[in-house]
């Protein structure tokens, strides 16, 4: 394993540890019957879902490194440059990097403090 791949592997191990910690933290919430608690539980359930998805991606990347198939596009079989994988180590296809370009072009709405929906937008 070369230095760049070792660095990616180490980063994935750290990601795994952090995601498992977050999953445990969000899984240990108290059950309450208040309406606000119900909203919080839905938000936590959504967070847990996304954390589990990311954790699965990390575990898959780690297993690919261990069995020697890391760095190859799942669609075409073409190698993916390690420089790109260092940025997005859970990428499974070469097309995964195209999405980051699309996300960078998007902007968030600019809210003025005088907008009526400003406060609501911050908490939705």
From Swiss-Prot:
PROSITE patterns: ZF_DKSA_1, ZF_DKSA_2. A zinc finger (dksA C4-type) spans 73-94. The keyword Cell division does not apply. The keyword Nuclease does not apply. It comes from the Bacteria. Keywords: Metal-binding, Zinc, Zinc-finger. GO terms for molecular function: zinc ion binding. Pfam families: zf-dskA_traR (PF01258). InterPro entries: Tscrpt_reg_DksA-rel_prd, Znf_DskA_TraR, Znf_DskA_TraR_CS. This is Uncharacterized protein YlyA. It comes from Bacillus subtilis (strain 168).
């Amino acid at each position: 394993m070369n230095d760049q791949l070792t660095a990616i592997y180490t980063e994935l191990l750290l990601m795994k540890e952090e995601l498992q910690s977050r999953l445990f933290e969000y899984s240990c919430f108290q059950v309450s019957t208040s309406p606000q608690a119900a909203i919080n539980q839905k938000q936590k359930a959504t967070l847990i879902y996304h954390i589990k998805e990311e954790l699965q991606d990390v575990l898959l990347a780690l297993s690919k490194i261990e069995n020697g198939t890391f760095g190859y596009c799942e669609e075409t079989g073409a190698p993916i440059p390690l420089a790109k994988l260092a940025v997005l180590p859970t990428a499974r296809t070469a097309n995964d990097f195209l999405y980051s370009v699309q996300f960078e072009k998007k902007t968030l709405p600019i809210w003025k403090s005088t907008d009526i929906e400003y406060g609501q937008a911050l908490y939705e």
